A protein has these predicted regions:
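Catalytic or ion-coupling anion/metal-binding cores of large enzyme and transporter domains
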Residues: 1-266, 270-351
Length: 351
């Protein structure tokens, strides 16, 4: 119900910023993006925040750029203090709002922020939050009483994901943070959906479901398919979570042991394309690794035999999209929209 009010307030503020000449380059610095990353971790944010913030930073300029490494560093030092689902187990965003909202959360975690960063209000972040109050410390926890001692997200790397992959450990069963299991591989979303509904599917809770061809180019558009459904056979046995790996995304309200954003994606020949059903995969979230348990020689042999899929588009917007879209680790933006792609674009001539 407050969205129209907030939209109107944003519109008024944008007009005021024009009159104040408070332009994006006066606000967006790397420190702002690092503040945003730390706040996202404390919030128990969506995995999509990684893609958005990386893309925004790369548009803001080379001096502002953040990477998966910045998220990994933040995830090791900033605890989750917003006790809301899916990281929390009881409260919703409405409860968060009435507990003090974002200003209160930022005040609670101010030790992890640079207070001198300029904001769209024309004031620093420190000035913005100085009078904020927490009205319910079970919803917005003190740092000493965090619901999860490390950040909401973890960045994994290994021979399956040399460019990185992402998991939300605060929203998955603890037993899957260190796990080795056999892969069950699907090359398309329809194939996966059909298989998981088969009550005779050869699958156990220890299996790792793998969905590929769901990345930026393979999807196309990196759809939110990453929260793969638990096979019906296992659901009837009471299983509610299992490891799942894909080059897709998932919604911020989704949960489970889902490893997402595998980069480079399988559609362009990333190592995820080389995984076979039955291969053992080891995931070690505390040590930030994800590994296909085969030799480098075997991996090279599979790569040599890999055949690229036929192009999805040969003309039009789909062709342009496939040609210019970046991988997840680089923000899934068009390469030509980054500031380092070419010279600045001048204002158009008006005749």
């Amino acid at each position: 119900a407050s969205h129209p009010r907030m939209a109107a307030a944003c519109g008024r503020r944008i007009v005021d910023m024009v009159w104040e000449d408070l332009t994006p380059e006066k606000i967006l610095g790397k420190v702002n993006f690092l503040n945003a990353i730390n706040a996202a971790m404390a919030m128990g944010c969506s995995t999509n925040a990684i893609i958005h913030l990386i893309a925004m930073s790369r548009r803001a300029g080379k001096d502002c750029m953040v990477s998966l490494d910045d998220f990994d560093l933040a995830s090791r030092k900033v605890p989750v203090i917003a006790n809301i689902r899916p990281s929390g187990d009881q409260y919703l965003m409405e409860d968060f709002y009435y507990a003090g909202g974002m200003p209160a959360l930022l005040k609670q975690m101010k030790g992890h922020l640079n207070p001198n960063a300029m904001t769209v209000t024309g004031k620093t972040i420190g000035e913005n939050i100085k009078d904020a109050q927490v009205h319910n410390e079970d919803v917005i926890r003190p740092l000493a009483n965090a619901i999860y001692q490390e950040g909401a997200l973890a960045v994994l790397k290994g021979n399956i994901a040399p460019g990185g992959a992402v998991i939300k450990p605060s929203a998955c069963a603890e037993k899957f943070l260190k796990h080795t299991g056999p892969a069950l591989v699907f090359d398309s979303y329809p194939d996966m959906k059909k298989a998981v509904e088969d009550e005779h599917l050869d699958v156990t809770e220890d299996h790792i479901l793998v969905l590929r061809n769901a990345g930026p180019k393979g999807g196309p558009g990196m759809p939110e398919w990453g929260m793969l459904p638990i096979p019906v056979k296992l659901v009837k046995q009471g299983v509610r979570d299992m490891l799942r790996i894909s080059d897709a995304r998932m919604s911020g309200t989704s949960y489970g042991a889902c490893i997402l954003h595998v980069s480079p994606e399988s559609y362009i020949g990333g190592p995820l394309a080389l995984v076979n059903t039955g291969d053992l995969i080891t995931v070690d979230v505390p040590n930030r690794t994800i590994q296909l348990e085969i030799s480098d020689e075997e991996l090279d042999q599979r790569k040599a035999k890999w055949v690229a899929p036929a192009a999805k588009y040969e003309r039009g917007y789909g062709w342009m999209f496939s040609r210019h879209i970046l991988q997840a680790e680089d923000g899934c933006d068009f390469d030509f929209l980054e500031t380092n792609f070419g010279k600045p674009v001048p204002e158009p001539d008006i005749f």
